Amino acid sequence: MSGLPLVQGSYKTSQDQRSLVGRISPALAFYPRIFPIIFRAGAMAKRGRYDDEAWQASSLAVARTLEKAGARLDITGLDHVASLEGPCVFIGNHMSTLETFVLPVILLPFKRITFVVKQSLIDYPVFGHVMRSRDPIAVGRINPREDLKAVMEGGAVRLGKGISLVIFPQTTRVPEFDPKEFNTIGVKLAKRADVPVIPFALKTDAWGNGRLVKDFGRIDPSRTVHFAFGAPLRVSQQGAAEHQEIIRFIVLNLKAWGGVVKE
């Protein structure tokens, strides 16, 4: 499977890769090209032919399309992922649709993964076929007790199969980070399954949240796309210290990138 070319666990868009259309209208360079990627993936998934290799290829195509629209990617810390044996729980903030599309090409070269996602994402036309094929854990974000049970039970099963979980412990994706809205569900799962946590921080508001349709907002190449992965953490006792360390990691990176953190 082909992925992003890494140098010492990092990737940076090497130069301005904007197409002619991207220089005129980033959104016009991006959306008309991303829809065929989604439709092809959905068709393959519906036929039961969408595997990890196809997922990574689709994700890479989205990343390259972003770059042609003018976006710059800056990814660091993948040496921590590469050196960790066995499955883990990836825990980070959630900002836009971008991370759902791009994280697979970042992580699949090292780990089999799936996501904890909202049930509504599973029910989407076309893209829902893609998500269901990845065997995610679906939560309603309405009943916290039911969501906790789904993540604890479903997460243990998948981790037992060697599949790592990507968890966004927030109720929704938002451009600013509020530590008070960042729950402990990922840490609890890692503790129960006895696997490490890899914290990650991201700033993906180059793909904005739309006013009418949240998934399709403004494409703003002036905002660099950042991903940073931290050193693995082993959860001890009830996980309070590790939870705070994850928050600290996210806050430090967001502030360094010029992101918004609610104090």
Predicted regions and their residues:
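Residue-level preference for the first positions of well-ordered beta-strands
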Residues: 87-89, 162-168
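Hydrophobic/aromatic ligand-binding patch that stacks against planar heteroaromatic rings
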Residues: 106, 130, 157, 188-189
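Catalytic core of membrane glycerolipid acyltransferases/transacylases, capturing the structured
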Residues: 29-44, 84-143
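Membrane-anchoring hydrophobic helices of lipid-metabolizing enzymes
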Residues: 1-87, 102
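Short, glycine/acidic-rich beta->alpha junctions
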Residues: 95, 99, 147, 178-182
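Active-site metal-binding loops of divalent metal-dependent hydrolases
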Residues: 171
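Membrane-interfacial amphipathic helices and adjacent loop/beta segments
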Residues: 47-78, 111-153
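A cross-family acyltransferase "interaction/gating" segment
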Residues: 77, 127-128, 164, 175-241
